[in-house]
């Protein structure tokens, strides 16, 4: 099976989940478990990095929608990183490109979140 997942804490409330390979019916449960774990650990903002992902299916979309619902109840957000046109097209066709902010690189996603986070004076 061609799948790998890595989770990284970028700051107190920002986590990144990097997915590689195929995220489908068989691998999405592991992705869902990681996403729920970082939310339980206090993540308010989660970046899901599809940079090394070769395939997603409707199961993946369901995990993302479930995650964004949980995060938004705590004023959080789910941000996506994806530059693969085949994958971004799936978000456009389903209308989910209006639900998620999608960036071409992790740096862009982090910068966008940093701009929205309240600064401590």
Task: Locate each region found by the language model.
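Short low-complexity stretches enriched in small and charged residues
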Residues: 1-7, 36, 57, 110
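Broad hydrophobic/π-residue packing in well-ordered secondary structure
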Residues: 2, 55, 68, 103, ...
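STAS-typified acidic loop motif
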Residues: 3-33, 50
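General small-molecule cofactor/ligand-binding pocket signal
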Residues: 6-8, 81, 103
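Short, flexible active-site-adjacent loop segments at beta-strand->alpha-helix junctions, enriched
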Residues: 11, 84, 106
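Acidic-residue sensor for enzyme active/binding pockets
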Residues: 22, 92, 108
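Amphipathic alpha-helical interaction surfaces in cytosolic regulatory modules
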Residues: 25-100
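A charged, well-structured terminal subsegment
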Residues: 102-121
């Amino acid at each position: 099976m061609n799948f790998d997942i890595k989770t990284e804490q970028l700051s107190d409330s920002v986590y990144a989940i990097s997915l590689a390979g195929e995220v489908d019916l068989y691998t999405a449960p592991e992705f869902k478990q990681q996403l729920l774990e970082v939310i339980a650990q206090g993540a308010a903002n989660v970046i899901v990095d599809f940079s090394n992902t070769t395939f997603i299916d409707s199961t993946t979309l369901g995990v993302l929608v479930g995650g964004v619902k949980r995060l938004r109840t705590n004023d959080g957000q789910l941000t996506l990183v994806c530059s693969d046109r085949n994958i971004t097209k799936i978000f456009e066709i389903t209308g989910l490109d209006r639900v998620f902010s999608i960036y071409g690189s992790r740096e862009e996603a982090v910068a966008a979140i940093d701009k929205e986070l309240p600064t401590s004076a």
